[in-house]
């Protein structure tokens, strides 16, 4: 096994790095702490690691000081918690002169493939002169349990598929600063493409047929590798049927009871506890996200219906039956993922008389913003419904501003509650920060 690991290490050091489009996210390293990058499969984590490696090389770090392993490599299938020490043994067998004298930069891709990896990384960082970077497709890598097992030696960052601004970077369209008329038209045209293709890097620029095929491949890989195999699911068809129902009902409300009843109607014997587990696993894989009602009572947050969203709006189009999902749902999903990329605490809001606001976002400084999503406000009845609901919520929460995201409309509405900004989706996405300080 040691010879195999040595071979993999040396092979990588001779490999040309494919660094792709530079991501706007920046992982900051802290001395003595592992940097963990987590997110959905095929979302760009490995490519981002190559970008970090390239920056190190450009800064004068020798290629021999880079140790990279992808734990999804079939040749590493036999690695277990009790023999992970072979990695250090293999590396220092190649470069004995570097031990305890030079910093080794370790990149362990998809390390969650080896259960119980945490003590190895913790020990490695305590005993060797190194910097450690990890990637994984499991939100468990954010958990307090891992922080405990790593003795506080880890900092985590989430990576999502391309933001709209990163998509513009891929298209080589300048989007920073004030936009000229020509640049604005280019940005608007690019938004229509982003609307069709979504943010997964691999599908950018592909034909519709190939994009759908690849999205569906992602869908099945996530289900089988991240859920069914990882959790040894005894009734995989129930997981698959549930995933399809949830994608078909993107941006809609659900309850555990309704989902359990749906699976029962298909002949599955999945109790409520199993359905709750499935939902947790979907979220853990960064595939589907649950949004709860905004309420001071945790019990009411849990018992009220919840909304479901997918990691990528275009993936919904590629996977769903198309019967229940409409462009309004897709726009709402797009806005959700843009917000979730920055802010983990997102809820929906219900006014005292039952009017719903799509998103209330809790910022890091505990201030709150309200975001409503509506394709178009041109119909008078729709305009009245959306603005009245937002005004009510603003008044109840003591907020002076609110936002309605549309496909193309742009205006400001002043009423007694405050200012409602109506903004087209492309502008809303550009106005969002790329990271939270």
Regions found by a protein language model. Name each.
Residues 69-101:
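Short glycine-rich substrate-engagement loop in P-loop NTPases that contacts/grips substrate
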Residues 37:
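Hydrophobic anchor at the beta1->P-loop junction of P-loop NTPases
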Residues 65, 208-367:
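Accessory nucleic acid-recognition modules appended to NTPase machines
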Residues 1-26:
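N-terminal pre-Walker A segment at the start of P-loop NTPase domains
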Residues 2, 10, 139, 145-253:
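Interdomain motor-coupling "hinge/lid" segment immediately C-terminal to the ATP-binding subdomain
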Residues 58-74:
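Conserved catalytic segments around the Walker B and adjacent sensor/switch elements
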Residues 407-437:
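Domain-level recognition of nuclease-like catalytic cores that cleave nucleotide substrates
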Residues 45-46:
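Conserved lysine of the Walker
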């Amino acid at each position: 096994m040691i010879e195999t690991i040595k071979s993999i290490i040396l092979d990588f050091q001779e490999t040309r790095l494919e660094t792709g489009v530079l991501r706007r996210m920046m992982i900051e390293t802290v001395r003595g702490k592992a940097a963990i990058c987590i997110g959905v499969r095929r979302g760009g984590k490995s490519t981002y690691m190559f970008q970090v490696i390239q920056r190190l090389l450009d800064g004068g770090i020798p290629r021999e000081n880079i140790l990279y392993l992808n734990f999804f490599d079939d040749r590493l299938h036999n690695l277990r918690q009790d023999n992970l020490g072979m990695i250090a043994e293999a590396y220092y067998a190649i470069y004995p002169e570097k031990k305890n004298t030079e910093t080794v930069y370790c990149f362990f891709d998809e390390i969650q493939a080896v259960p119980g990896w945490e003590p190895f990384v913790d020990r490695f960082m305590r005993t060797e002169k190194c910097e450690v970077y990890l990637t994984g497709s499991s939100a468990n890598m954010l958990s307090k349990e891992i922080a405990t097992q790593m003795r506080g030696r880890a900092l985590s960052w989430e990576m999502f598929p391309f933001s709209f601004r990163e998509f513009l970077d891929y298209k080589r369209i300048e989007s920073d600063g004030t936009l000229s008329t020509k640049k604005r038209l280019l940005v608007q045209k690019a938004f229509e493409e982003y609307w069709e293709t979504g943010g997964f890097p691999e599908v950018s620029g592909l034909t519709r047929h190939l994009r759908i095929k690849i999205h569906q491949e992602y869908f099945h890989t996530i289900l089988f590798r991240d859920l069914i195999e990882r959790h040894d699911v005894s009734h995989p068809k129930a997981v698959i049927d549930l995933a399809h129902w949830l994608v078909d009902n993107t941006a809609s409300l659900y309850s555990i009871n309704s989902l359990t009843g749906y699976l029962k109607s298909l002949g599955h014997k999945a109790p409520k506890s199993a359905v709750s587990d499935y939902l947790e696993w979907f979220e853990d894989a960064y595939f589907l996200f649950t949004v709860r009602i905004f309420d001071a009572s945790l019990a009411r947050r849990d018992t009220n219906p919840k909304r479901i969203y997918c990691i990528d709006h275009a993936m919904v189009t590629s996977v769903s039956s198309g019967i229940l999902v409409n462009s309004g749902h897709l726009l709402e999903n797009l806005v959700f993922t843009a917000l979730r990329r920055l802010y983990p605490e997102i809820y929906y809001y219900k006014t005292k008389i039952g009017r719903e606001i799509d998103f209330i976002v809790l910022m890091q400084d505990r201030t709150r913003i309200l975001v409503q999503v509506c394709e178009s406000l041109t119909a008078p009845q729709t305009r009245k419904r959306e603005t009245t609901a937002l005004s009510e919520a603003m008044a109840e929460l003591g907020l002076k501003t609110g936002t309605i995201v549309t496909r193309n409309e742009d205006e400001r509405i002043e009423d007694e509650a405050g200012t409602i900004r109506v903004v087209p989706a492309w502008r809303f996405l550009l106005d969002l920060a790329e990271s939270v300080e």
